[in-house]
């Protein structure tokens, strides 16, 4: 869970800071479908504690580095379209 990478489209530009910076991607990424499967979905960003409370079975670590996103009712998240 911790330190995964995802792409999000922002509604407005951001200023770079200690916590916001460009990320260099590998020049030779893996073949799509071999180890990665891209998904696209319109989802909501949720408060991290909301995710921890809603899904105790996942035993999410107590860290603020995780971006909580999806639909609380289920069915759409990083693994499902």
Swiss-Prot record:
Keyword flag Hydrolase: yes
GO molecular function: serine-type endopeptidase activity; toxin activity
Keywords: Disulfide bond, Fibrinogenolytic toxin, Hemostasis impairing toxin, Hydrolase, Protease, Secreted, Serine protease, Toxin
Cited Pfam families: Trypsin (PF00089)
Cysteine pairings via disulfide bonds: 51-68
The enzyme's E.C. designation: 3.4.21.-
One Gene Ontology CC term in the entry: extracellular region
InterPro entries, per database record: Peptidase_S1_PA, Peptidase_S1_PA_chymotrypsin, Trypsin_dom
Protein role: Thrombin-like snake venom serine protease.
Record-linked PANTHER family: KALLIKREIN-1, KALLIKREIN-RELATED
Designated name of the protein: Thrombin-like enzyme collinein-3
Organism (species): Crotalus durissus collilineatus (Brazilian rattlesnake)
């Amino acid at each position: 869970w911790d330190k995964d990478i995802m792409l999000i489209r922002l509604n407005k530009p951001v200023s770079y800071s200690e916590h916001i910076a460009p990320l260099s991607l590998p020049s030779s990424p893996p073949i799509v479908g071999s180890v990665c499967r891209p998904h696209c979905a319109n989802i909501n960003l949720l408060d991290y504690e909301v995710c921890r409370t809603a899904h105790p079975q996942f035993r999410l670590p107590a860290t603020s580095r995780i971006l909580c996103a999806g639909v609380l009712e289920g069915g759409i998240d990083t693994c499902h379209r």
